[in-house]
Amino acid sequence: EPYDEGYHVADSVEATSTLCSRACQAGLKIFNLMSIEDVMTRDEGISGLVLNWSSVEMAGLHVDPLTVRARAVIDATGHDCEIVKVVERKIGPELNTPDGRIQGERSMWADVGEAALIENTREVYPNLYVAGMASNAVYGAPRMGPIFGGMLVSGRRVAEMIIEKLK
């Protein structure tokens, strides 16, 4: 519902469940309870992910992982920026950041964090993009708190960037 010029208030559960439902209706496949073990690399950069079931990891079982090839990978894992952490740990300080490393999320400052989120949505390593709170964690911006608008715009922006690159 409208709150002020350019601002809306929404029930968070209804809004996010509707987004998930509509995305699934459009063809999205959600792989629930999966963990990233590694990334796949080729000369041109990141080329996919190495995944396993979270329960396998938790139980310490020896189960071969699944590999998923991709021309572009998005780290939208939130504050933990899990995929970028794997790249930093395994490839080294080669990220598209001031010192090649994850800069670390700053303490909450909602309006500054929301503005930075859009700017920080970008390619952090060849074929690896960051969106949402992962982008602020990678580029050292403040966390945002309970604000969804920037997250949605970040998701749209990263999609547009990838579509343009893959043309």
Q: What are these model-predicted stretches?
A:
Residues 1-167:
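Residues forming the flavin
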